Amino acid sequence: MNLRVLPILIVTSCLGACTTLQGVLVPVSQGATGTQQVDMLVATTRQRTEPAEMFSGARGSALSYANIRVSIPPASARKVGEVQWPQRTPGNPATEFVTTKADVIDRPQALAWFRRAVRTTPKRRVLVFIHGFNNRFEDAVLRFAQIVHDADAPAVPVLFTWPSRGSVLAYGYDRESTTYSRNALESVLRDLSQDPAVSEISILAHSMGNSLALETLRQMAIRDGRVAPKIHNVLLAAPDVDVDLAREAITDMGPKERRPSFTLFVSQDDKALAFSKGIWGGGARLGAINPDAEPYRTDLAHSGVNVVDLTRLRAGDSLNHEKFAQSPEIVQLIGRRLAEGQTVTDSRVGLGDRIVQVTAGAAGAAGTAAGLVLSAPIAIVDPQTRSTIGGHVEAIGRGVADTVRPW
C-alpha cells in the first residue's frame, strides 16, 4: 500500500464525514427564484433505511427504485462543477442543493416514470450514471444532479447506485458490492433498452463504478450475444480497474462494430488511483495510465478506445480524482457530445476545434499555456478543425500546439 497517499485519503474521508449532515435528502417545503430542477430515476441495490437517509451502504436483497428531484441554486450562487452542500437542514434552495421530491417507488412505477420521461425528452436519449468508491447514497444523488445540470444534456437521467459504505476503510467491501450488483445493473439496462421510444443510451461510470459497468456489459454480451444495440457510448472516468481486466472485458464484448464506443478519461496525477494501485500490489489502474506509453498506446488503438488525458488540468479536489465532473469545460464538453448523439471524439463535427476551446479555457483557469493535454485518434484533428486551430493557439500561446496531438 502507498503509505504516503493513505493519510491524504483518510483525512479527506474524515472531512467529508464530519461536514455531511443527516437528512439532506428530505424535501424542502419552499423553493427559491432562479433555481432549476433535475428530476431523476434511481435504481439501487442498497438496503432501504429510515426516510431521512432513504438507502444505506448495506446490500439490499432486491433491486429498489426511487424518484428524486434535486433543486440546483441559481448560477449566481454557485460555481459550475461543484455541489453546494447544505450547511444545515433544511437546506437553503437559494444557495444550496436540496431536494423537492424524494419518493421510494416500485418497479411498475419506475417504468411508468421512465416511459413518460423518455417521450417528453428531445431525441429520446438516456444517460445512466454509476458512481465510484466511498459514496453514500446522498453523495451519488447530488453529484449526478450536478453533472446532469452542468452538462446540460437533453437526456433522461438514470442513477444506478450500488452499496458503498461511504468509508475509505471499506475498499474491499465496496469492491465486492460492485460484483454483487452486476445482475441488477444488467436488468436495469435491459429494461431501458427495451423501451421502443428510447433512441440511445449512454453510460457514464466513475472510479470503481467502471468495474461494475465493464463487467456488466461483458456479462450482457456473453448472455445475449452482444451488448444491447441502443447502448451507444460508454464513458470511463478515472476507472479504478486493472488494465488487463478492462482489456479482456472489452474484447469479450465482441468486435468493435458490435459494441459501444468507449471513451477513457485518465489523469496520471490521480492520488486515489495511486492508493488503489498499492492495494492491488502495484497493478496499473486504467484511469492513471500514460496513453502514449507502450503497451497502452498499441492496446488502446487496437481496441478503438478514445482517450482524453486530463493530467495537466487542475482539479478542485485534492486527490485529482473527479476532474471529469469538477472541470466546467470537461463536463460541458461531455454534455454537448451526448446532446448531439456522438462520441466524445467524433471528428465529423470539428470536435478537435471544440477541444482546443476547452484547452483555452482550462489554460486560462490554470495559468498555464498547456492547461489540458488531450490524447485521441489522429482523426480528431480533422480538416474543419485545422482551418480554425490557429486562432485558438494564438489566444493561449504557442505551447498549446503540442496539447492536441495524435494518439
Would you name each region that the model predicts?
Residues 1-7:
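Bacterial N-terminal signal peptides that target proteins for export
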Residues 23-103, 112-113, 118-121, 141-157, ...:
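Lipolytic serine-hydrolase domain surface
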Residues 125:
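Alpha/beta-hydrolase fold active-site loops
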Residues 128-132, 206, 238:
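The conserved beta1-alpha1 loop
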Residues 136-140:
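Short substrate-entry loop that stabilizes the transition state in hydrolases
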Residues 185, 205, 209, 213:
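Gly/Ala-rich beta-loop-alpha elbow adjacent to hydrolase catalytic centers
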